[in-house]
């Protein structure tokens, strides 16, 4: 599942864009929310981030990962359920499709109560940058983005 | 903060010209024309990508006859398979023949995901086949791809022209450069030429109604022999290549 | 809490049969057939409403030739004007010829608003003309109108059938009763009959490709004389009236 | 703009449905958020509510109206503006169209900065029931719905 590299690139690019905008000289840490639905291979993502950060403002950055459980709510019957309740029913290629495009959950997952594919992903869809800490002109800056 | 948005311009950086094939109206030939145009540009030695953005009803793969076993390769992202010299991306690789009950918001989220992980590489043209309507997909492609051009498809029917007029007004408001209008399924005299004039949009030419098209679908060699394909070549030469659109 | 949702069943309570005309695919004739069906049911002395739900590209008014000055009347809500014995509601009354850049979420919000304030009164049939796709509008009509029936339109093209197959699978999953499939723009032999059989959906009949249709658009008298209109009468008699659908 | 009657009906029906569900015997008050975009004629709405409540569980209910300013955010340039900034530019029939269907704002209103009709209605779209107070078996019940 080596497309984690592409996700790492998008994280690094985004952090660099924000650092530039906020005049951050050196990024100290980046907090990344990892939605369970996308089934990221965390080790690969970490390796990619550590390789990509070299020679950038992120050189010294620590990456903090916060895993977020995936939860759904049915628009038809309002039932709420968890990805972990239904994950075992997915075939390998179905799980991989969702890994690339989390919205394919609507193709391969149905409400366990009423069978509808028309549901909301309440949380845990994919990757989000939840905070960046860095140094501007010597003083630390905290940002909850 | 969504990390996907800032990488998209990066992923599309080495693509010279991005063209969204739009109409507002369904069933006017957007998918047939997008697919044929990609094939023909490739035969003219251009590097071409084709991205089927109709995530409720993808169908470029049917026009091209892309076999089911062909899949993108995972390599630091997704590399779209090359079929008949065209780099082709579609949600169909993943959803196969299953229902796609994606709401507008989900569809654009899926499009953003694919835009952010697909490695097109160097291209002369990326053709984007849009769904009908002037809804999420059209609005977000305009928002996300700042240098996209619009290529408008219509039939001569009254039922198409009113919707296409709404679309053209919208593209002008949003300052999207319009390459022009292609009239598809023309028979007899054209009202579209006058329509284009009235709307102040370039009329690029007409493709005839062709009842041999249906049996050619899925077979690229047959397709390229149809009257539609042959008429399209002239439009590509005069209206797509070297045309930088009228920014409205 | 949204007060509109609980009034909708109330507003539709005196309507015997609600029919959503759907396809997944654009340009297959949903709008033409919805409009003609409403006219013909009215001529059979049925009380009929027609609601154009394609809020990006409304077009029933073009088929019917509804003049621009006709407007709903405000009276404890909105009363749809009666045109040729059909109570007709459309966003076009309000938006005229302007662009309608509504995202899926906005479109359904607008639909919910109109459903909650429109007073249809007693009707035998309410025909809902849906946009292409299996997105917000289709999903929300199914969610909001629990007793809606689906009437599926397709052309014989391969490009329509794959999308229609996705739609039928979805309707079955969502347990929407399907009245059947109408094959539109038929020429020569039908593949749709076999398709319907394979999908286990009733085949209701075919409407021929008719090149006199275009000039009849907007003129009800001419429209009712077309081959399409005449073929549709038989389908209405045998396939719409007294058909309660196969709940899948 | 007498379609306020239809809106009043939907409010009363919804409150009655909730009251039934929560076993409320008598509704004491209903708080209604009135989004500015819809340009409700409050006097007509009040009259309609007072007429419709007769002979129902709402007989004794007080209606409390909380007006909510309408605000937009452009998806193209992120500009935020208020309905009151642009209201004066609407023609009578345009304002009436928005009165019936607030989403028609996308037809008649554009971002004052960049001209885009692709914006989010941040708040003040239409009518919402924000709270219901009532009596269940003699004891008052509060509900923030
Ligand atoms: N020039 C043409 N002559 C005959 N049939 C055509 C022509 N162009 C398109 N078609 C047919 O019209 C239908 C709609 O075309 P399609 O490309 O799917 O439209 P869209 O993508 O706009 O919905 C298809 O069945 C297609 O085969
Ligand atoms: N039976 C028919 N013969 C010829 N043209 C048709 C027929 N049915 C529909 N059309 C034409 O096909 C186009 C698409 O029809 P429309 O009703 O707008 O489809 P949809 O609502 O599915 O998008 C229109 O130009 C219409 O006039
Ligand atoms: Mg298409
Ligand atoms: Mg859509
Ligand atoms: Mg239509
Ligand atoms: Mg839509
Ligand atoms: Ni991967
Ligand atoms: Ni009113
Ligand atoms: Zn459910
Ligand atoms: Zn703006």
Regions found by a protein language model. Give the residues of each.
Chain A
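N-terminal, polar/charged subdomain of small-to-medium soluble alpha/beta proteins
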Residues: 1-29, 36-145
């Amino acid at each position: 599942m080596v497309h984690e590299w592409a996700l790492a690139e998008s994280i690094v690019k985004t952090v660099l864009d924000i650092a530039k905008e906020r005049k951050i000289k050196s990024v100290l840490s980046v907090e990344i929310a990892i939605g369970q639905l996308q089934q990221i291979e965390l080790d690969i993502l970490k390796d990619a981030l550590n390789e990509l950060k070299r020679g950038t403002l992120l050189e010294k950055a620590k990456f903090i990962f916060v895993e977020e459980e995936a939860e759904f709510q049915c628009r038809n019957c309002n039932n709420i359920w968890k990805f972990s309740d239904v994950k075992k029913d997915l075939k390998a290629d179905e799980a991989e499709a969702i890994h690339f495009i989390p919205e394919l959950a609507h193709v391969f997952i149905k409400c366990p109560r009423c069978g509808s594919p028309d549901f909301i992903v309440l949380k845990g869809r994919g990757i989000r940058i939840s905070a960046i800490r860095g140094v501007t002109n010597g003083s630390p800056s905290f940002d909850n983005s | 903060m969504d990390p996907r948005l800032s990488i998209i311009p990066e992923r599309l950086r080495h693509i010279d010209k991005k063209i969204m094939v739009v109409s507002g109206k369904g069933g006017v030939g957007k998918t047939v024309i997008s697919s044929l145009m990609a094939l023909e540009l490739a035969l003219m030695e251009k590097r071409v990508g084709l991205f089927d953005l109709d995530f409720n009803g993808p169908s470029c793969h049917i026009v091209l006859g892309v076999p089911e076993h062909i899949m993108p390769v995972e390599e630091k992202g997704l590399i779209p398979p090359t079929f008949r010299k065209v780099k082709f991306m579609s949600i169909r690789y993943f959803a196969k023949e299953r229902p796609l009950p994606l709401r507008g918001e989900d569809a654009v989220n899926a499009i953003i995901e694919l835009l952010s992980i697909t490695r097109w590489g160097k291209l002369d043209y990326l053709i984007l086949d849009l769904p009908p309507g002037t809804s999420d997909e059209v609005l977000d492609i305009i928002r996300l791809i700042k240098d996209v051009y619009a290529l408008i498809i219509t039939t001569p029917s009254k039922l198409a022209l009113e919707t296409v007029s709404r679309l053209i007004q919208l593209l002008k408001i949003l300052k999207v450069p319009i390459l022009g209008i292609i009239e598809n399924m023309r028979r007899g005299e054209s009202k579209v030429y006058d329509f284009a004039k009235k709307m102040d949009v370039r009329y690029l030419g007409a493709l005839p109604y062709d009842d041999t098209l249906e049996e050619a679908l899925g077979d690229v060699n047959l397709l390229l022999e149809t009257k539609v394909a042959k008429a399209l070549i002239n439009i590509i030469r005069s209206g797509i290549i070297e045309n930088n659109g009228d920014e409205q």
